Amino acid sequence: MATTKQKVTAPSPSPSSSTASCCPSTSILRREATAAIAVVGDGLQNWTNIPSVDEKQKKTASSALASLPTTEPLSTNTSTKGIQIMTRAQTCHPLDPLSAAEISVAVATVRAAGETPEVRDGMRFIEVVLVEPDKSVVALADAYFFPPFQSSLMPRTKGGSQIPTKLPPRRARLIVYNKKTNETSIWIVELNEVHAAARGGHHRGKVIASNVVPDVQPPIDAQEYAECEAVVKSYPPFRDAMRRRGIDDLDLVMVDPWCVGYHSEADAPSRRLAKPLVFCRTESDCPMENGYARPVEGIYVLVDVQNMQIIEFEDRKLVPLPPVDPLRNYTAGETRGGVDRSDVKPLHIIQPEGPSFRISGNYVEWQKWNFRIGFTPREGLVIHSVAYLDGSRGRRPIAHRLSFVEMVVPYGDPNDPHYRKNAFDAGEDGLGKNAHSLKRGCDCLGYIKYFDAHFTNFTGGVETTENCVCLHEEDHGMLWKHQDWRTGLAEVRRSRRLTVSFVCTVANYEYAFYWHFYQDGKIEAEVKLTGILSLGALQPGEYRKYGTTILPGLYAPVHQHFFVARMNMAVDCKPGEAHNQVVEVNVKVEEPGKENVHNNAFYAEETLLRSELQAMRDCDPFSARHWIVRNTRTVNRTGQLTGYKLVPGPNCLPLAGPEAKFLRRAAFLKHNLWVTQYAPGEDFPGGEFPNQNPRVGEGLASWVKQDRPLEESDIVLWYIFGITHVPRLEDWPVMPVEHIGFVLQPHGYFNCSPAVDVPPPFACDSESRDSDVTETSVAKSTATSLLAKL
């Protein structure tokens, strides 16, 4: 379910409202200036053909767009035929997330397009996101309009280089739920950036397309969760059930609505449903009281979320509240024994010359890496256009787009209510929508660049989550070292990585998502799991093998967490090129014989994954299995194809039986790796709308039935990685972070180690002796007898 987060909220716009430009500092193109560069067209078709143009001319042409006056007065012509409009230079990169202004205009445009007042009044806005343009548009922007300003990114044409005068308008995609009709629709709005003499800078929207999507339910919104909790707590039979359990103060009661999933026809998307879980806090005067320590069980509630009515209620079984746990809380001063550690000294991260990264809008450069940062309500952090600056070979692409597109959490207890706890946290709630405002010194350390995120709320207003994405450098221990044993001379380098991250809360759990970029060309994807266990209550003397007893009457069910990373790769591929393939590598043991007389031989065997059905693969640690994405037309100095390999970390597969109900919607969990040929609209492994989805195997499992060829293609990797959580007492009351992830590592991509040119550490052999630890600096133990007992 959704959670409260720090936001700045703007009111819902009316259809006629005007908003500020997304980039108010950008220059205005004069009407006269357009003639100097070309007649401005409506899209990519209006380009100026230049059959032969050298690099100097290209720079001159592209700089002409950026060097126009910023203080040019507006026209004072006030014709009665309409407001005078002046074309603006492109101010937002085609991959930049929608600004607050763009979201407001998109919402207002859709609301104004409603056919009747009833339709307009019933509109609720689930999601407003950028329609990501074709890769050729991205190449165009990166060549002439925005960093890295590299015209070599443009595909070669017979007519020579082409310099455009403008980029096509940005577009927004809206998922709209109509609360009155229970219909879900998708809208596409074109956002034209204009400037009007009377109203100042703003956007103008135009509906390009709209359609109603039948037989689906979109994600549940945070406002719906809050309303659902209030409806349940005010329901008289529910209040009676609480009194039967000795709960008179309803302010102590927590109602966490969960999506119902799809277990039978009763869960069909013809109704918008939620089945809440109920908990009870012990104290009301503690703002961080751990209410999850006392689950209230034996009560069945089904809520019609569309009409906010309880349609089914049953007090099935009186399960006593678990006893009050003195170890339930985790805030400072309320931990075990009520004493916090006193021997933790300050640790400061100091960069006296500032960071090594450079930021231009959403464009990031660091240690030969460059990429763009995006963000969506569903996925959260998105990394675009990943490339590496490789000396004379220039900017070499690695991936078009990297993101986490889904996560599924199935529980292993067959008893009610735990058997129906199968959360799709991205598709049913939204990872980005539940992201936090991060705090300096707590979530990130060092010299930090934050990025805000803008969303629509349920009624169409704009909400801003400040400091939503954190970007910073981290020391990461040793990068490489060698000491010559003959001379005693040594060379050592310390590793540094650039980390981009965000953190979200979904009900009781926290998930922190990271993309790490390393100096040796490696990219690491990491998820950190923490938060509070989802617990169950037990009858006196009861024991369940499907979980871990926390204390008598309270237990934590076993469960699994699965994450799906979607990676549209581009190893040495310019936008528009489709020259990648995937090979699987298994290390084989040589059979004894004349080729293996010493019985010690083993070797790596490669298998080309030729089609999508062949590319449904699982991890195999016994053969050190990994997969390499290679460019079919680029070689290294040995003549081998350049590539990047996916190296699995610890992983698992679903432990539920093959007929488990949640696998109807999560068939993609049946394999660790899927490979598909890129196709627009194939974005989420369980389909666009997994909430209450009755269709078996929608999404990835259906797409691969086309069995498209992969031998030379635009490749998308879908890597599913999971963890099986058998709870420990040490996971209570709040879980220490659990790490899970994988690595993308260069494999024949470079001609040698890209990390050999990292300079020696600045502090090597120059550390002050004052930093050496002596016996006198060792802190005395502060353990008390009470702490020792606990």
UniProtKB/Swiss-Prot annotation:
Record has Metal-binding as a keyword: yes
Cofactor names: Cu cation; Zn(2+); L-topaquinone
PTM comment text: Topaquinone (TPQ) is generated by copper-dependent autoxidation of a specific tyrosyl residue.
Residue list for modification 2',4',5'-topaquinone: Y509
GO molecular function: aliphatic amine oxidase activity; copper ion binding; diamine oxidase activity; identical protein binding; primary methylamine oxidase activity; protein homodimerization activity; quinone binding
Residues reported in the UniProt entry to bind substrate: 423-434, 506-511
Phenotype of gene-disrupted mutants: Altered nicotine biosynthesis.
Pathway, per record: Alkaloid biosynthesis; nicotine biosynthesis
Free-text remark on how the cofactor is bound: Binds 1 copper ion per subunit. Can also use zinc ion as cofactor.
Enzyme class, spelled out: oxidoreductase
Residues engaged in binding Mn(2+): D714, I715
Induction annotation: Accumulates in roots upon auxin deprivation. Induced by jasmonic acid (MeJA).
GO-annotated cellular components: peroxisome
Function: Involved in the biosynthesis of pyridine alkaloid natural products, leading mainly to the production of anabasine, anatabine, nicotine and nornicotine, effective deterrents against herbivores with antiparasitic and pesticide properties (neurotoxins); nornicotine serves as the precursor in the synthesis of the carcinogen compound N'-nitrosonornicotine (NNN). Amine oxidase which mediates the deamination of N-methylputrescine to produce 4-methylaminobutanal. Oxidizes preferentially N-methylated amines.
Family affiliation: Belongs to the copper/topaquinone oxidase family.
The protein, known as: N-methylputrescine oxidase 1, peroxisomal
Taxon lineage: Eukaryota, Viridiplantae, Streptophyta, Embryophyta, Tracheophyta
